[in-house]
């Protein structure tokens, strides 16, 4: 793909899984690349996801293989399991900051500049909000993101990715209105999300360790 190539069109599962790979590369590098099981756990997280999904293992595996076909994901083999890493930055010639922004938009839908800035801390470094706006403008110029028109009562611009085709602006505005009453402060939310992600990564590592032990026991008993 080049800068003039149209962006890929991803379905819901593909978009969620790609976003998870981007996130976990930065937040849990020791567990990255991800196994199918780890990708499923990440995709179905109850925190830092909009909407919350319940993807089955087969759906996640299929999404990974489709992303691999598109060149956005690469499979790596280890002694224990298949592992997958994203290639979004190299395939679309994006900076780390731009990849982080796409990842956040894939995982949490349309967001304001302030929300993106608060949530990006663990994914990439931005000098300030103006620096982030510069990277968002670049994504918009590339046709990878869009700035949404403000709905009635909204005071800030919102941004969304375009990797899943044309946007349903009315649906995005309705989702933003539903989310507004339950919004928590950025610092409290970021702290909670960090703890939850660390716990979820630990659970995945324990599950994989148990699976490896079970495989050795099965082999010994064969």
Swiss-Prot record:
InterPro entries: DUF480, WH-like_DNA-bd_sf, WH_DNA-bd_sf. Belongs to the UPF0502 family. PANTHER family: UPF0502 PROTEIN YCEH. This is UPF0502 protein XAC4278. It comes from Xanthomonas axonopodis pv. citri (strain 306).
């Amino acid at each position: 793909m080049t800068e003039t190539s149209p962006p890929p069109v991803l379905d819901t599962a593909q978009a969620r899984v790609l976003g998870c790979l981007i996130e976990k590369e930065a937040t849990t590098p020791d567990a990255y690349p991800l196994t199918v099981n780890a990708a499923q756990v990440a995709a179905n997280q109850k925190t830092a996801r909009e909407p919350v999904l319940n993807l089955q293992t087969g759906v996640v595996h299929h999404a990974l293989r489709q992303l691999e076909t598109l060149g956005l994901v690469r499979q790596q083999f280890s002694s224990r399991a298949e592992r997958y890493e994203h290639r979004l930055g190299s395939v679309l010639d994006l900076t780390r900051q731009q990849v982080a922004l796409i990842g956040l938009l894939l995982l949490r839908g349309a967001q304001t500049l302030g929300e993106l800035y608060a949530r990006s801390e663990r994914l990439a470094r931005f000098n300030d909000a103006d620096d982030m706006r510069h990277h968002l403008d670049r994504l918009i110029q590339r046709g990878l993101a869009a700035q949404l028109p403000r709905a009635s009562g909204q005071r800030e611009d919102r941004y969304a990715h375009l990797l899943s085709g044309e946007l349903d602006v009315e649906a995005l505005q309705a989702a933003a209105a539903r989310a507004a009453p339950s919004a928590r402060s950025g610092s409290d939310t970021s702290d909670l999300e960090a703890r939850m992600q660390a716990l979820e990564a630990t659970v995945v590592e324990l599950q994989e360790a148990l699976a490896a032990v079970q495989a050795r026991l099965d082999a010994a008993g064969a």
